[in-house]
């Protein structure tokens, strides 16, 4: 069958690479795709924006697309799934009403409270003065979040009152995130270890993907600004078998059942960004309605099952008929970013040193990369993600670092400590 993947990042390159391996996939189209997806076997880019829903629907009808997988959040929040379903097309992702779990942080916090799902204490604000009063009552450290979508950058972890007040003013009166910041959520700072827990949902059945841990801060030792993610590894040792079952019981099933009870049946990938507290309790920091980026890259390297089959079963409400199979090795991905990211960054620098041919257990997934006159040049903040499998997280990390060193362009940078928590655990054994 023909398959369509919507999006143009490193995550979509990883999804396209995995989908193309399926015997069920004759041809894989990526809209709009990037220079990485263009190079994959059986894969073709289509020049349609990820948010141009009428054009995507028409393309899917013209090419007789048997399955569509949505990569990024923006099309989900504006209703791409609803439009495809109305046209009788099979698509894996949540409908617009269910995608509010990512589209509005205030919606999510209120939903969690209604269903007694553990999360940080919080309040929502649309006016500056009441928000400032609340900040002064609660003290720091404290977290200020823009309500809507802000490409992973709308969260400020404020260590001083001044930082917190500036964030509130920037969002509510300074319009730092436009419409996304017209309402803010202020919540308590949770001190634990973060983990990404991604599952597939068919409305009622849930199939967990491998656990992972992302690294949000731009600098080593988790310093500097928040980003969309500077690297990730899988599995995350903080998620022990016991904590895994707690997450399913206390977070995932109550969320899926709660959404269904409220008339927003959830299908698609559901990504719970969690804080694992020192006592082992998982608390929800955020939900995303899609696979994470960069978590997808190391997770896809470990997935042994046919992703197309999993998605088709999920679309048909039959996820209980399949169990995903995973490589027991660890995988780790390091993002190589353009100078200046996550603020204003340079574009157009020529990239050299990319592997000429496929290497077993290693893969470079391209993201912000364009082709110009036969050369690959930087075209985004997060340019690519070097990913490797290893017998341990340390081994995967060392392989990925070696791969990263070979790839060059002017001003490129990356974190050399991705996976440090897991590596420390391994060294203590």
From Swiss-Prot:
Q: For binding ATP, which residues are annotated in this chain's numbering? A: 135-196
* Cofactors, names only: Mg(2+); Mn(2+)
Q: Which PROSITE patterns match?
A: ATP_GRASP (PS50975), GARS (PS00184)
Show where the ATP-grasp domain sits: 109-316
EC number(s) recorded for this UniProt protein: 6.3.4.13
Cofactor info, note text: Binds 1 Mg(2+) or Mn(2+) ion per subunit.
In the record, what terms sit under GO molecular function? ATP binding; metal ion binding; phosphoribosylamine-glycine ligase activity
Biological process (GO) annotations held by this record are: 'de novo' IMP biosynthetic process; purine nucleobase biosynthetic process
- In this chain, Mg(2+) is annotated as bound at 286, 288
Which InterPro entries does the entry link to?
A: ATP-grasp, ATP_grasp_subdomain_1, PreATP-grasp_dom_sf, PRibGlycinamid_synth_ATP-grasp, PRibGlycinamide_synth, PRibGlycinamide_synth_C-dom, PRibGlycinamide_synth_C_sf, PRibGlycinamide_synth_CS
Alphabetical keyword list: ATP-binding, Ligase, Magnesium, Manganese, Metal-binding, Nucleotide-binding, Purine biosynthesis
Query: Family per UniProt?
Result: Belongs to the GARS family.
The identity of this protein, by name, is Phosphoribosylamine--glycine ligase
Query: Top-down, what is the taxonomic lineage of the species of origin?
Result: Bacteria, Pseudomonadati, Pseudomonadota, Gammaproteobacteria, Pasteurellales
């Amino acid at each position: 069958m023909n398959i369509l993947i919507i999006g143009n990042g490193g995550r979509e390159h990883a999804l396209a690479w995995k989908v193309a391996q399926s015997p069920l996939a004759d041809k894989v189209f990526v809209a709009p795709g990037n220079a990485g997806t263009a190079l994959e076997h059986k894969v073709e880019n289509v020049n349609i924006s990820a948010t141009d829903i009428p054009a995507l629907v028409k393309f899917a009808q013209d090419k007789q697309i048997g399955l569509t997988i949505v990569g990024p959040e923006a099309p989900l929040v504006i209703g791409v799934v609803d439009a495809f379903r109305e046209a009788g097309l099979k698509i894996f992702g949540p409908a617009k009403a269910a995608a509010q779990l990512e589209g509005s942080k205030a919606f999510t916090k209120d939903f969690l409270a209604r269903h007694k799902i553990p999360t940080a204490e919080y309040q929502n604000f649309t006016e500056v003065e009441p928000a400032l009063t609340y900040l002064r009552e609660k003290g720091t450290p404290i977290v200020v979040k823009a309500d809507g979508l802000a490409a992973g950058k709308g969260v400020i972890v404020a260590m001083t009152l001044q930082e917190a007040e500036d964030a509130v003013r920037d969002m509510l009166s300074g319009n730092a995130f436009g419409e996304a910041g017209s309402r803010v959520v202020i919540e308590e700072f949770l001190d634990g270890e973060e983990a990404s827990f991604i599952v597939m949902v068919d409305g009622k059945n849930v199939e967990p993907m491998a656990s992972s841990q992302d690294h949000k801060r731009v600098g080593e030792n988790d310093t500097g600004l928040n980003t969309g993610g500077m690297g990730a590894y899988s599995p995350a040792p903080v998620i022990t078998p016991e904590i895994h079952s707690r997450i399913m019981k206390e977070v995932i099933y109550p969320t899926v059942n709660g959404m269904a009870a409220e008339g927003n049946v959830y299908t698609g990938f559901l990504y719970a960004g969690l804080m694992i507290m020192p006592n082992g309790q998982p608390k929800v920091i955020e939900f995303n309605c899609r696979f994470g980026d960069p978590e997808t890259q190391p997770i896809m390297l470990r997935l042994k099952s046919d992703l197309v089959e999993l998605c088709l079963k999920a679309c048909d409400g039959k996820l209980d008929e399949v169990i995903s199979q995973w490589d027991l090795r660890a995988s780790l991905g390091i993002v190589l970013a353009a100078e200046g990211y996550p603020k204003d960054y340079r574009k157009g620098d020529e990239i050299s040193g990319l592997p000429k041919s496929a290497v077993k257990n290693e893969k470079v997934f391209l993201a912000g990369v364009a082709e110009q006159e036969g050369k690959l040049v930087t075209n985004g903040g997060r340019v690519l993600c070097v990913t490797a499998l290893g017998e341990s997280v340390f081994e995967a990390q060392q392989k990925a670092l070696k791969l990263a060193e070979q790839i060059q362009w002017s001003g490129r940078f990356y974190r050399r400590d991705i996976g440090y928590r897991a590596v420390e655990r391994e060294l203590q054994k």
